[in-house]
């Protein structure tokens, strides 16, 4: 079988790649990328998986579908490429980080430093048509990302951070006897004041990792990401 992800995720998801729904999704995407503008760029679709191998995942921050503006999405939930303005939801995540763990603000939204430590930045849908939120829902991505969540749950000792209703709906896939689940409203400007601010997900994540005798996450991002492209 063709290699889609260049680490242990390939083996974990190989059964999914062989199923009819994935073949249909592949055909749909070929057509979409050929005829319209789709984000992220094709080579970035599986970036979250490439950055954080299966056996290294400690934390999952679950997003919905990718940012649908130009130059924003690069395959990782909430993250944007260097040089791109920090989107409103991520600004609110940074505000909560400041009050929760004393995060020093940065002027970029490139979250690779988290991914490198085992924070899996997964969207439930991995592509989107430009300017059309949710336009690639129900095409097969959910089945694939559900399989990824279920595999991590089975492996155990993962903190799942679920913000907003569509992320919370994935709770049913998670075995809470051997994993931890933290939920709050979505950090978008519309919802953040209704329970996102003050939810302390970052310090709670690290408390849980310490209980499992795992190294906590250093949530501080580097001030300069020009070197990390």
Curated annotation (Swiss-Prot):
Membrane-spanning ranges: none
Catalyses which reaction(s): Hydrolyzes single-stranded DNA or mismatched double-stranded DNA and polynucleotides, releasing free uracil
Enzyme class, first EC level, given as a word: hydrolase
Keyword terms, alphabetized: Cytoplasm, DNA damage, DNA repair, Hydrolase
GO molecular function: uracil DNA N-glycosylase activity
Active site: 65 (proton acceptor)
Entry-linked Gene3D superfamilies: Uracil-DNA glycosylase-like domain
A cellular component annotation (GO) from this entry: cytoplasm
InterPro entries hit by this protein: UDG_fam1 (IPR002043), Ura-DNA_Glyclase_AS (IPR018085), Uracil-DNA_glycosylase-like (IPR005122), Uracil-DNA_glycosylase-like_sf (IPR036895)
Family indicated by similarity: Belongs to the uracil-DNA glycosylase (UDG) superfamily. UNG family.
Name of protein: Uracil-DNA glycosylase
Source species of the chain: Latilactobacillus sakei subsp. sakei (strain 23K)
Gene behind this protein: ung
């Amino acid at each position: 079988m063709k290699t889609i992800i260049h680490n242990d995720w390939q083996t974990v998801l190989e059964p999914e790649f062989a199923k009819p729904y994935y073949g249909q999704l592949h055909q749909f995407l070929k057509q979409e990328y050929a005829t319209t503008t789709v984000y992220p760029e094709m080579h970035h679709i599986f970036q979250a998986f490439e950055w954080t191998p299966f056996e290294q995942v400690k934390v999952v921050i679950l997003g919905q579908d990718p940012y649908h503006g130009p130059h924003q999405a690069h395959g990782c939930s909430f993250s944007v490429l260097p040089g791109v303005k920090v989107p409103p939801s991520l600004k609110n995540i940074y505000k909560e980080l400041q009050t929760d763990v004393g995060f020093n603000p940065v002027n970029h939204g490139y979250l690779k430093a988290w991914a490198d430590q085992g924070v899996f930045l997964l969207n439930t849908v991995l592509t989107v048509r430009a300017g059309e939120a949710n336009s690639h829902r129900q095409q097969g991505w959910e089945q694939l990302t559900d399989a990824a969540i279920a595999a991590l749950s089975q492996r155990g000792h993962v903190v799942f951070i679920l913000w907003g209703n569509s992320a919370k709906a994935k709770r049913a896939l998670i075995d809470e006897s051997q994993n931890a689940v933290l939920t709050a409203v979505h950090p978008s400007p519309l919802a953040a004041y209704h329970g996102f601010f003050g939810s302390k997900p970052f310090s709670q994540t690290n408390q849980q990792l310490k209980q499992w005798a795992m190294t906590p996450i250093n949530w501080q991002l580097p001030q300069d990401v020009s070197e990390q492209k």
